[in-house]
Structure formats: C-alpha cells, structure tokens
Swiss-Prot record:
The keyword Cytoplasm applies. Its main location: cytoplasm. The gene is tpiA. It catalyses: D-glyceraldehyde 3-phosphate = dihydroxyacetone phosphate. The keyword Methyltransferase does not apply. GO terms for biological process: gluconeogenesis; glyceraldehyde-3-phosphate biosynthetic process; glycerol catabolic process; glycolytic process. Transmembrane segments: none annotated. Involved in the gluconeogenesis. Catalyzes stereospecifically the conversion of dihydroxyacetone phosphate (DHAP) to D-glyceraldehyde-3-phosphate (G3P). It comes from Pediococcus pentosaceus (strain ATCC 25745 / CCUG 21536 / LMG 10740 / 183-1w). GO terms for cellular component: cytosol. Substrate binds at residues 9-11, 173, 213, 234-235. It comes from the Bacteria. This is Triosephosphate isomerase.
Amino acid sequence: MRTPIIAGNWKMNKNPQETQEFLDAIKGKLPDASVVESVIAAPAIDLSTLVAFSKDEQLKTAAENSYFEDEGAFTGETSPKALNEMGVNYVVIGHSERRQYFGETDEDINKKAKAIFNNNMTPIICCGETLEQREAGETNEWVAGQITNALKDLTAEQVAASVIAYEPIWAIGTGKTASSDQAQEVCHVIRETVAKLYDQTVADKVRIQYGGSVKPANIAELMGKEDIDGGLVGGASLDPESFLELVNYKG
C-alpha cells in the first residue's frame, strides 16, 4: 500500500517571516503522516524554520534543489550533506524550471539522485513533456526516456523508495490541467518503465505524483486514479487554507 504524498512546491516565494506565519496557520491541522504524507519544498532560506516546525508536526521538509557533490568550491550551490544534517527529508530534482532556465540535464539529475540517497534523503524526481511533444505524440517515449536516464545505476531499493513527479510542462502555471485520465495514462507509463528497468515489485512501491495546476477542486479526482499517489503543487500550496484542503482531501 503506497502512502499518498502531497508536496507543496513554493518555488522562489516566502521569506522566513512569511514561512512562520504559514506554519502557524496549519499547526495541528495536518493529517497523520501514515494516512497522507504532507511535504513542503521551500527556498533554502526557509528550510531551518520548516525543519524546526516539523519536529512536532506531521510535516516533512523538502529542498527545491541540491548539488551532486557534498562540499567544495561550488559557489551558490546547496550541499546535500548539509541538507541531511539540517534534518531535510526530500529534495526536488529535475523540475522543468531547473531544466529550462538553468540547463539541467538528465545526467545532472541522475548524479543528484545518487548524492541525495548517499546522504539519507529521498529525491522527488520530476519529468514531463512540452506541448509540442504532446501534440506530436511523443509524450510516452519522452517521459520514459527521462525516467530511464534519471534512475541509471540506482539500486532497486533506492528506486522503490523514490518519488517521481509527472509535471506536463504545458500545464504548469498556465491554468491548463491535464485531465485526470491524461495524468493517469502518463503515470501508468512511468510505473511500466520502472517495471521494465527493475521489476513489478519495485514499480508497485514507487510513489508517483502529478504536478500541473493541482488545486483543491481537482485533487480528489486525481488521487482516485490507480497510478497517481500524490501531487506536486505549486501556486495552490502558497495559501495555508488551500494547502490544508489539499492534504486533507480524504476528509
């Protein structure tokens, strides 16, 4: 049985004071982590505030990126070793914005995934296609390729523990949402790809999120699909009431 995982991705929003105000508003209102795992991915400057809060609450913390080396002369990068020592649980890697604006490659993402596991955290590995690729009928092949490259040389145990987020680029921040059937179709392809690379047992354990204009209004329908185990939520996670509606979608 896969535990649902709803993760808010704040992107480059909220300072530490705004973070504390958000946390004060959700205090004591999150579901038990055994029912739905609630996660917030936040800018590095907010992580210490989140980690301190999470010690007494049903919340897990995620960084929005990390480097693939533990330390060294890499100005501006975030050390996975330091994130782990800080108490961070997850790291989002391969987000379409990182790929588009910062030139991240599948090889970079694979190296980051290994570094995250080596530092006892779990990657949330993002994948997804552009509108042009979808209209050309290339979605399944493209996403399967991204997953194959991202998981290269990871152990079966590591892959089983991973979270994979399908985020159709054409549905991020555009107001367009993949229908629940479209989202399920690609999430099924992701699970099939993992089964081919490893085996069905591993594929049945990996948790797959959908990310692309997820809101309280559509979360229950998405979560009703067989291969969708969670959401990676952008804008709708910035408001505490909206975030609470999302993580408490079961009622």
